[in-house]
Swiss-Prot record:
Provenance organism: Mus musculus (Mouse)
Family: Belongs to the IspD/TarI cytidylyltransferase family. IspD subfamily.
Protein name: D-ribitol-5-phosphate cytidylyltransferase
Database matches in PROSITE patterns: ISPD (PS01295)
Sections of the chain in a coiled coil: none
Gene from which the chain derives: Crppa
Pathway info: Protein modification; protein glycosylation
Gene3D superfamilies tied to this protein: Spore Coat Polysaccharide Biosynthesis Protein SpsA, Chain A (3.90.550.10)
């Protein structure tokens, strides 16, 4: 077993609670375990995440749990979701011996906490059993405390929420075993030996078994201890083991749509899209004047029209280092508006604060430098030449996961042309924020 570091920067979760910290993009969950009635408290809880799969169905050499999503291993997102739930005391991840060092590197690089490692077995059930042994007091090398309840969850289901974790844990405390379920999407059929339809299941009467699942530790550990070699080799359903060997009928808990499992290549694209959507929900507009009539405020209004579902806040450049730190706790997109001239000193100050926040360690941060001038007063080519420093700066900060680009806005005296330029600027910024395309880093775009 390998304990992970005990602290890390916070980051956006999916309606999960935990200590607030720099980089927390979403509000804490309304769940309050500390103030709950005794019967509604989870008790001592640990989690086991089997991560020894080889990704055969995905058809890639890299096991899917280590495939990168936005330049970060998929399993890191799952660990993030679990460790932000403060009442989960220990998280045991089972990985193959050949991937043990890679897993240690992930824990160290992304500052994951409360993580211990155990070696995976040859099958899913054997891996889970090894994870349970890491928590069992009857094992001579056990360094962890046996929990009252243990959660079993897939390393490739990164969008698990605290609400469903709490509900399955409380159900497990009452019934001994519990698991999340979802409605069947497709009808399940049984083929005959010669490849013809034998019978089909009534979709309305059946459900898909999902993760997370939770058990009284003594129940599931006893089930695995009694488990036959056949079940350990070919079984896949933990709830069935609790029923078969400990006679505990699991309580089935309806789960949210986000419980889906990353299984195929296209699922990685879907996961990336969901993560991008989560971290693109807020934009901070940094401008160099408080004047309500300034182009910065006009651009802010244009962004509100373009992105009517996003939260858009603003601050003044003079406040960088003060108010801006409050925005950093919630925001992954910054639009810096400079009407008069490029002010690289203030820009570098903002970038330095972002780097010190450790925010870019976990997610790509978008920074767009908007420079406003009347295209009729200064030749566009001349203006672009004066901004070549943006490319060098963008290349420098890209190494730290900050995606910086420039935008030239036509600050025309003609009201119609100005409104057109503001609309185009808002559309360009929206695309940069939503897509987070590293290929556009250092580019000077024109609206």
């Amino acid at each position: 077993m390998e304990p992970g570091p005990c602290s890390r920067p916070a980051e956006p979760g999916h309606c999960v609670s935990g200590p607030a910290g720099a980089g927390s993009a979403f509000p804490e969950s309304p769940l309050s375990v500390a103030g709950a009635e005794p019967g509604n408290r989870p008790g001592t809880v640990a989690a086991v995440l089997p991560a020894g799969g080889c990704g055969e169905r995905m058809g890639v050499r890299t096991p899917k749990q280590f495939c990168r999503v936005l330049e970060r291993p998929l399993i890191s997102y799952t660990l993030q979701a679990m460790e932000r739930v403060c009442w989960i005391k220990d998280i045991v991840v089972t990985v193959t011996g050949e991937n043990m060092e890679a897993m240690r590197s992930i824990i160290q690089r992304y500052g994951h906490k409360r993580i211990s490692l155990a070696e995976a077995g040859a099958t899913r059930h054997r891996s889970i059993f090894n994870g349970l042994k890491a928590l069992a007091e009857d094992q001579p090398d056990c360094k962890l405390t046996k929990p009252e309840v243990v959660i079993i969850h897939d390393a490739v289901r990164p969008f698990v929420e605290e609400d469903i974790l709490l509900r399955v844990v409380l159900a497990a405390k009452e019934h001994g075993a519990a698991g999340a379920i979802r409605p069947l999407v497709s009808t399940v059929i049984s083929p005959s030996a010669d490849g013809h339809l034998d019978h089909s299941l009534d979709r309305a009467k059946h459900r898909a078994s999902e993760m997370p699942q939770a058990f009284l530790f003594d129940v599931i550990y006893e089930a695995y201890q009694q488990c036959s070699d056949f079940d350990l080799e070919f079984g896949t359903e933990c709830l069935q083991l609790a029923l078969k060997y400990c006679h505990r009928k699991a309580k089935l808990v309806e789960g949210p749509p986000a419980l889906w499992k990353v299984t195929y290549k296209q699922d990685l694209c879907a996961a990336e899209a969901m993560i991008k959507e989560k971290i693109s929900q807020e934009i901070c507009v940094v401008m160099n004047t408080k004047d309500e009539e300034s182009v910065g405020h006009l651009l802010e209004e244009a962004l509100r029209k373009e992105l009517n579902c996003m939260k858009i806040t603003s601050t003044v450049m003079d406040h960088i280092g003060g108010d801006i730190r409050n925005f950093i706790e919630q925001c992954y997109s910054f639009i810096c508006v400079n009407v008069v001239s490029p002010d690289s000193q203030e820009t570098r100050k903002l970038l330095r604060i972002l780097e010190e926040s450790s925010l870019p360690l976990l997610y790509p941060v978008v920074v767009v430098l908007v420079h406003c001038f009347d295209f009729t007063s200064v030749p566009l080519a001349q203006k672009m030449e004066s901004l070549v420093w943006i490319r060098g700066l963008a290349k420098e900060v890209k190494e730290r996961n900050i995606l910086l680009s420039g935008l030239l806005l036509n600050y025309s005296q003609d009201e119609q042309k100005l409104q057109e330029s503001l609309g185009q600027s808002a559309a360009i910024i929206a695309a940069l924020v939503k897509e987070r395309n590293s290929a556009l880093v250092g580019q000077l775009l024109v609206a």
